[in-house]
């Protein structure tokens, strides 16, 4: 009888310790995901090409990519991005001449390319870290820079005004800094 009690006590202690371990891992996972999940907007963007560019057609070329992009008078309104437990999507801005296909006048507009990200939580002992991948866009470089902040570097192709109603395509690297605007629960 005493032996059965001891065995039951040992089994009970083992069950409690196993359930505590799972709760502890869940807490680590949640804390890691809290650093990244949410709704984001672009805070700044830098053109990393050899020469400054003029996306908005004002005649002033700049390396301030995001300011140039915002200066384009037409195009998408919502350029926010959203990250959650398993990943999310990040909108990368670029410019495009919508009339180039049919030979119409230059009409450069703002566009975004949505890139999908996968987030994985790696638990190693008492530490948790996040790993990020972009299965459809292997050229994306992602850096988690702080709580609710990250940068993305990607090569983009943009249309730039070339003066007198002409345009040309330019391809180069851009680095964008994103900042969380609102926390997202899931």
Where do the language-model regions lie?
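Edge beta-strand at a domain terminus
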Residues: 148-186
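Acidic, glycine-anchored loop motifs typical of Ca2+
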Residues: 53-62
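Generic short beta-strand segments
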Residues: 41-50, 120, 124, 151-162
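Sec-dependent signal peptide hydrophobic core
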Residues: 7-12
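Bacterial Sec-dependent N-terminal signal peptides
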Residues: 4-5, 16-44, 178-186
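Mature soluble binding/inhibitory domains
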Residues: 61-63, 67, 73-76, 178-184
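Contiguous, well-ordered beta-strand patches that form the walls/edges
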Residues: 48, 71-151, 179
